[in-house]
Regions:
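Short, tryptophan-glycine- and acidic/Ser/Thr-enriched carbohydrate-recognition patches
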Residues: 1-11
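Extracellular/lumenal carbohydrate-interaction signature centered on repeated Trp-anchored short motifs
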Residues: 40-51, 126-129, 159
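A short beta-strand element within beta-rich, extracytoplasmic domains
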Residues: 48-58, 164-170
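Extracellular beta-strand ligand-recognition surfaces/modules
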Residues: 73-78, 114-122, 130-180
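Extracellular beta-strand elements of beta-rich domains used
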Residues: 166, 184-188
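Extracellular/luminal beta-rich ligand-recognition
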Residues: 71-120
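Solvent-exposed strand-to-loop "edge" motifs in beta-rich extracellular domains
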Residues: 54-60, 83, 140
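Short carbohydrate-recognition loop motifs
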Residues: 13-36
Length: 191
């Protein structure tokens, strides 16, 4: 965790590496808080387009509208960023979330950042909590799908080839609730 940068927005979500189900995982506990942990990376999506991870959510944040600022809370989310700074208009991000109320595979713009940060509900309101889930996403294809096909493979590669950062966030500051999530191994692969 020493290579991760921590940014507290509201309160302090606690991130701790713990043993769980025979593996070492990251436990995130939010109590009316929002803290993001970020790691600069340089991932070539031409070589390794697939993001693989496992996660487990212990709490649903039911009754909130996650597509609004007042409901933008998630027990678990993983950001992938193209660009050096989310304040830069050219920077784009995908935010894979475990949604408490949106259908699985739905997509919407982040209510704070707008169109440059796209939310994708990898898990939705009907998914069972308190169970490990393994995920695999073709990040390169997701970037094309959410930010648009540039018209040719060459232009798509130029726009979407490299990732510059990954971030993890468990937050419940807007709803004032509590949430706990666990994150297993996160890695990129060719298939």
């Amino acid at each position: 965790m020493t290579s991760w940068q921590v940014k507290h927005f509201v309160g302090r979500t606690q991130y701790v590496v713990v043993p769980f189900d025979g593996q070492r995982v990251l436990r995130a506990t939010s109590n009316d808080s929002a803290t993001i942990i970020t790691k600069p990376i340089r991932i070539d999506l031409e070589e390794t387009p697939y993001l693989n991870w496992s996660w487990r959510v212990e709490d649903q944040l039911s009754g909130i509208n996650e597509t609004t600022k007042s409901g933008d809370d998630f027990a678990a989310r993983i950001y992938l960023v193209i660009g050096d700074n989310l304040l830069n208009p050219a920077t784009k991000a995908i935010n894979y979330v475990w949604s408490s109320n949106q259908p699985r595979y739905s997509r919407w713009s982040n209510p704070f950042a707008g169109e440059k940060v796209q939310m994708i509900a990898v898990r939705g309101a009907t998914d069972t909590i308190s169970q490990w889930r393994k995920e695999k996403r073709n990040v390169y294809q997701d970037l094309i799908n959410v930010f648009g096909d540039k018209g040719s493979e060459h232009k798509n590669r130029k726009a979407y080839r490299y990732l510059d950062a990954i971030a993890i966030m468990t937050d419940s500051d807007n709803s004032g609730r509590a949430a706990t999530a666990y994150y297993g191994d996160i890695f990129f692969s060719t298939k």
